[in-house]
């Protein structure tokens, strides 16, 4: 899959190993069942969930099914055990590959038919799976809610910000594209931001599916003037 970072004017290709990914975003019912929240649960995507909460949910889903949790969480620091069988957040390369399902344009079909956006004039996320799926059978990868990914957005500019992808129900149609990248602090939540889980086992503990711990570390060491025009970092 080819990725594109418009801010840095950078394109790169990632060769992916086989992986699994959810057909829909995680629903409020699924979240409530595992996490014991007070909500009764519905088929709407769970939202207002930050990145760290998404990580905790993935581990809970793994434990519930007798799988090895993908994440070690220690005092707020998260380590991905790439050789674990459990559920996890997709890397952004996995997410974009899954979203595109073999297509190369901004959408995998007519946007009004595949995703909920501002064009639909809805006031909250809709139940999952109501619009047409892509060729892989995945629903709502574009529109309805953004979905957290594992990767850092850009350590040089945004520190610990994590990527989210896909676009939400309130976003204008021009911004809801398979290549659009956004991000936020791990503790940030939003009414149109949820998650979709993935699975896959890999040999390299420091790099997998387009993510590299070494690359993040090197990028994070960059100092000095950064390009103007970027979205300010929020603390």
Where are these regions (language model features)?
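A short glycine-rich, aromatic-capped structural motif
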Residues: 1-62, 143, 201
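Short, solvent-exposed loop/turn elements at domain surfaces
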Residues: 2-7, 28-30, 96-97, 172-175, ...
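Short, solvent-exposed loop/turn segments that connect beta-strands within catalytic domains
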Residues: 5-9, 83, 155-158, 204-207
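Residues within well-ordered beta-strands of beta-sheet-rich folds
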Residues: 20-22, 149, 196-198
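Functional-site microenvironments in short loops/helix caps that host divalent-cation chemistry
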Residues: 40, 51-182, 186, 191
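Short, flexible loop/turn segments with low-complexity composition
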Residues: 70-75, 207-217
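Short, structured beta-strand segments at or near domain termini in extracellular proteins/domains
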Residues: 191-207, 224
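Short, cationic low-complexity segments
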Residues: 211-235
């Amino acid at each position: 899959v080819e990725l594109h970072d418009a801010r840095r004017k950078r394109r790169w290709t990632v060769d992916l190993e086989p992986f699994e990914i959810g057909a829909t975003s995680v629903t409020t019912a699924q979240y409530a069942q595992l996490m014991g929240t007070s909500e009764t649960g519905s088929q709407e995507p769970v939202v207002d969930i930050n990145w760290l909460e998404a990580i905790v949910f993935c581990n809970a889903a793994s434990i519930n099914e007798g799988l090895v949790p993908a994440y070690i969480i220690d005092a707020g620091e998260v380590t991905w055990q790439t050789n674990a069988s459990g559920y996890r957040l997709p890397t952004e390369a996995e997410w974009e590959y899954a979203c595109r399902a073999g297509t190369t344009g901004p959408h995998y079909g007519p946007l009004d038919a595949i995703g909920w956006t501002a064009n639909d004039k809805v006031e909250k996320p809709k139940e999952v799976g109501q619009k047409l799926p892509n060729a892989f059978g995945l629903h709502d990868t574009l529109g309805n809610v953004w979905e957290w990914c594992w990767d850092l957005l850009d350590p040089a500019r945004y520190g610990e910000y994590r990527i989210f992808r896909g676009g939400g129900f309130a976003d204008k149609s021009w911004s809801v594209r398979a290549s659009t990248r956004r991000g936020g602090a791990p503790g940030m939540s939003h009414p149109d931001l949820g998650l979709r889980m993935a699975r896959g086992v890999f040999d390299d503990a420091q790099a997998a599916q387009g993510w590299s711990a070494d690359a993040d570390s090197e990028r994070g060491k960059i100092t000095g003037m950064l390009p103007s025009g970027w979205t300010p970092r929020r603390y």
